[in-house]
Curated annotation (Swiss-Prot):
NCBIfam families recorded: leuA_bact (TIGR00973), PRK00915.1-3 (NF002086), PRK00915.1-4 (NF002087)
Gene: leuA
Protein name: 2-isopropylmalate synthase
BP GO terms, sorted: L-leucine biosynthetic process
GO annotation, cellular component aspect: cytosol
Functional summary from the UniProt entry: Catalyzes the condensation of the acetyl group of acetyl-CoA with 3-methyl-2-oxobutanoate (2-ketoisovalerate) to form 3-carboxy-3-hydroxy-4-methylpentanoate (2-isopropylmalate).
Family matches, as PROSITE patterns: AIPM_HOMOCIT_SYNTH_1, AIPM_HOMOCIT_SYNTH_2, PYR_CT
Length: 512
C-alpha cells in the first residue's frame, strides 16, 4: 500500500508575484480550470484580502472549480481570514492558508513583534479560521531559518487549535536537500501532536534546488504535500516546478513509493497556457515541458531511440501531453472540430459567445496561415478580446508604411472604453512607430523595460508572440500579443500591457 502525495498549486498566488506576471480575473479562471483538468489537489487561487481584484478572482474560481480544493492566502489576522472565508463561501471544498513569520530576523525587522506575540497571534488566527472553515493550513514564514525550539512551540500550538496542514517554507531558497529533509523530520519527531496534521513543503529556487529540496522534504522529512507552480513560476528565481516534482515522483515510484493524482497528459497544455498568459517563455531545455525535453540531436542517441526508446528516454513525451501530430486544423475545419480541439487542449471558454468569437478569430487566422498548430490555438484563446472581461483598450487595425532610408510611419485604430480612436506616429522602425502612435493618444508615461519576440511554431508562416513589459509607479506588468504580422502582435501586446497597468490594483505583498 502506498501513500498519496498532495499537489498544492500556487501559480495563481505565489507564481503571480513574479514581476510582470499579473493576470486578469478571466485569465486566472482559465488557468484554474486547466489546473482542475490536471487534477491538482489544491489550487491556491490568490490572496483575497490583498485587493478587490484578487477577492473577485478567488470568488470566481471558488464558484467554478468543483473537484479541487480552492484555497486563499491570509495573514494571521481576523480581517484577512474573514475576507478569505467570504471569497471561498461558494467553494465545494475550501481551505484558508494563514501565515506569520517565525524567524528572528523577520520578527524583529519586519513584524517588530516578540516571539510570544507571534505565538499568540498564530494561535488566535488558526482558532478564528477554524470557526469559519474546516480545512486550515498554517505556514511559519521563513520557517527554515527559524529557531527550531520556537518553531516547535508554534506548530504544536496551531495543530492543537485545529490546523490540518503544516507547511514549512524555505522562503528565500536557502536550504540544501539533505539538511531541509532532516529539518522537517526533526520537527515531526519532536512535536507531540505532529501526526494530527499533514506536513507540507514550499521551496523557492534561489540556489536552483527547489525541486530537490521539496523531494527531500518528502522522502527524508515525511511531508505529504508539495507546494509548487506551473513552469516553476514565481518571484526571484521561482518556485518548485509542478511538472518536475510530479514526474520525478511518478518516474521514480520505485524510490518514493508514492502515488500522485495528477493527469500528466495535461501538463504541456498547462505549461503553454501559463507561458502564453504571463509572457514568461519556457526555456527550450526546461525539464518535461521545454521544446527540447524529448529531442535527440546526437546520432548515437537518435539511433538508440529508434531501436528502443528506453535507451535514452525515461518517460514518454505523450505521457506529459506532447502530441506527435502537431498540425490539427486548417481553413476548412468547422466549428465543432475547433470546439473539440479546445476541449482536448484543456481550454474551456465561459460561454457560447466566447466560443463564437474565438472561432471567428480562428477562421481569420486560417485565411492567412495554412497550418494551424496547438500553439496557435492557445495563443488565440489567450487574446483578451476573446473573453467576456471588459478591457479599456482593444486592438482594431493597423497600417504602416516603411521604405529604405525613410522613417517608418504607423497608423493604429484601437478602442478606448468601447470607442474607436485613430492615432499616427513616426518611429525608428515600424514596431516603434506603432507603439508611439498608441502613446500619442494614451499618454500613459509607462517605461518599457522588456520587448521580446518568440515564434509560436517553426515555419516562416508562424505567428509571432510578442511580450511587452511596462513599468509605471512601481508596478510592473507583462502584455502578450500574437499575430503572423510582428508589428500587429507588438501593438496587441502593448495594449494588453496597458490594460493590465490600468486594472492592476495595489496589492499587499505576500511572501512565503
Amino acid at each position: 500500500m502506498t501513500d498519496k502525495l498532495i499537489i498544492f498549486d500556487t501559480t495563481l498566488r505565489d507564481g503571480e508575484q513574479s514581476p510582470g506576471a499579473s493576470m486578469t480575473r478571466d485569465e486566472k479562471l482559465r488557468i484554474a480550470r486547466q489546473l482542475e483538468r490536471l487534477r491538482v489537489d489544491v489550487i491556491e487561487a490568490g490572496f483575497a484580502a490583498s485587493s478587490n481584484g484578487d477577492f473577485e478572482s478567488v470568488q470566481a474560481i471558488a464558484r467554478a472549480v468543483k473537484d479541487s480544493t480552492v484555497c486563499s492566502l491570509a495573514r494571521a489576522n481576523d480581517r484577512d481570514i474573514a475576507r478569505a472565508a467570504e471569497a471561498l463561501k461558494e467553494a465545494n471544498r475550501a481551505r484558508i492558508h494563514t501565515f506569520i513569520a517565525t524567524s528572528a530576523l523577520h520578527m524583529e525587522k519586519k513584524l517588530r513583534m516578540t516571539p510570544e506575540q507571534v505565538l499568540e497571534q498564530a494561535r488566535q488566527a488558526v482558532r478564528f479560521a477554524r470557526n469559519l472553515v474546516e480545512d486550515i493550513e498554517f505556514s511559519p514564514e521563513d520557517g527554515y531559518r527559524s529557531d527550531p525550539d520556537f518553531l516547535c512551540r508554534v506548530i504544536e500550538t496551531v495543530i492543537a487549535e485545529g490546523a490540518t496542514t503544516i507547511n514549512v517554507p524555505d522562503t528565500v531558497g536557502y536550504a540544501i536537500p539533505e539538511l531541509y529533509g532532516n529539518f522537517i523530520k526533526n520537527l515531526r519527531e519532536r512535536i507531540p501532536n505532529s501526526d494530527k496534521a499533514i506536513w507540507s513543503v514550499h521551496c523557492h529556487n534561489d540556489l536552483g534546488m527547489a525541486v530537490a529540496n521539496s523531494l527531500a522534504g518528502v522522502k527524508i522529512g515525511g511531508a505529504r504535500q508539495v507546494e509548487c507552480t506551473i513552469n516553476g513560476l514565481g518571484e526571484r528565481a521561482g518556485n518548485c516546478s509542478l511538472e518536475e516534482v510530479v514526474m520525478a515522483v511518478k518516474t521514480r515510484r520505485d524510490y518514493f513509493g508514492l502515488d500522485v493524482g495528477i493527469d500528466t497528459q495535461h501538463i504541456v497544455a498547462a505549461s503553454r497556457m501559463v507561458s502564453q498568459t504571463t509572457g514568461f517563455v519556457v526555456q527550450p531545455n526546461k525539464a518535461v515541458v521545454g521544446a527540447n525535453a524529448f529531442a535527440h540531436a546526437s546520432g548515437i542517441h537518435q539511433d538508440g531511440v529508434l531501436k528502443a526508446r528506453d535507451t535514452y528516454e525515461i518517460m514518454r513525451a505523450e505521457d506529459v501531453g506532447w502530441s506527435a501530430n502537431k498540425i490539427v486544423l486548417g481553413k476548412l475545419s468547422g466549428r465543432n472540430a475547433f470546439k473539440q480541439r479546445l476541449q482536448e487542449l484543456g481550454v474551456q471558454l465561459e460561454s457560447e459567445g466566447e466560443i463564437n468569437v474565438a472561432f471567428a478569430k480562428f477562421k481569420e487566422l486560417a485565411d492567412r496561415k495554412s497550418e494551424i498548430f496547438d500553439e496557435d490555438i492557445l495563443a488565440l484563446v489567450s487574446d483578451e478580446s476573446v473573453t467576456s472581461e471588459k478591457e479599456q483598450f482593444g486592438f482594431v487595425s493597423l497600417a504602416q508604411h516603411s521604405e529604405t532610408g525613410e522613417r517608418p510611419e504607423a497608423t493604429i485604430v484601437f478602442t478606448v472604453d468601447g470607442k474607436e480612436v485613430r492615432s499616427s506616429s513616426e518611429g525608428n522602425g515600424p514596431v516603434d512607430a506603432s507603439m508611439k502612435a498608441i502613446e500619442a493618444h494614451v499618454r500613459s508615461g509607462a517605461e518599457m523595460v522588456l520587448y521580446s519576440v518568440n515564434a509560436i511554431s517553426g515555419s516562416t508562416e508562424s505567428q509571432g508572440e510578442v511580450t511587452v513589459r511596462l513599468q509605471s509607479a512601481g508596478r510592473v506588468v507583462n502584455g502578450v500579443g500574437a499575430d503572423p504580422d510582428i508589428v500587429v502582435a507588438s501593438a496587441k501586446a502593448y495594449l494588453s500591457a496597458l490594460n493590465k497597468l490600468q486594472s492592476k490594483a495595489e496589492r499587499v505583498a505576500a511572501q512565503g
